[in-house]
Amino acid sequence: MTAAAARVSSRVDAAVSDAANDARGELTKIPGVSKAVAAKAVRNGYYHFIVDIWITDLNFTEFGVYKRTRNRAKSRQFTSDMDIFAEVIEGGERTGLIGYREDLWEKAESKDKRLVFKLFNESLNWRATMDLMIGRSLQQTIASRGMPVMTYSVNTDEDNFIVYLERSANKWPLLPENFGFFIMDGEGKPQFYRIKRDLINLGGDYTLYDQQGKNVGHLDGKVFSIGGKWKGKVRVEHADRRLLTVLQLFSALQIFNADSRRHMKRLWKDVGRGKVKPALDAQEADLYKNPRRVR
């Protein structure tokens, strides 16, 4: 091969390599996710993540009294009763931490009990909040005559829309539960999803379906005695930061799922017997206000 031919061959190889790199970059372009993380998290057409519920004293080690005080000073979303209990891993690195308002759930009276999750990034900046909406949940539970039907609101830091995740009342005993929600896309159109618990599962496995009933993701759960781990995957054409956030918070919710159902069942009974007068938190009440009201 002549020197000129060798140079041409070298340029061709470089062009092919650049094209391949560009193609890989396009395939791993996930809205709201850095290219570096996406490149490592995308495999076989799916975006992968892990939600790991801590079963060691890592919580106290990393978020003891001193660091709690420092974190509260850094973010007003990190309240004094915030208990960090899970981490989110994407592309092999920790990208998020999930906590809940411990006092609101563990210590509050029945009518004041609220389940509030918060998702932070690695540096403890707020990314999202998931709230159990007592008003909507009680309304649905009353309508279903005692079948616990929970509604959760998900508010993310970069979205103008709130996502409402609801448990379906269309459930027979011993059959899988379903949850539904929708996300507004970049063109202002809703994209609907359903999360269905697998009929045969040992650790809280769920499958994600799109509005056409196609399987587009899965949550593979491994529940331990005092913790758990969920390995999630979503088809890359559906994956964006908002959907990933909903699924990550939903995974963390699973260790509270049974308690949440029992709470709504108990509240429904107490309200029906006149033992409790329902009350809504001011922040939740704001979500029900008429957006066209005179201010």
Give short role names for the model-derived ranges.
Residues T2-R295:
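Intrinsically disordered, low-complexity proline/glycine-rich segments
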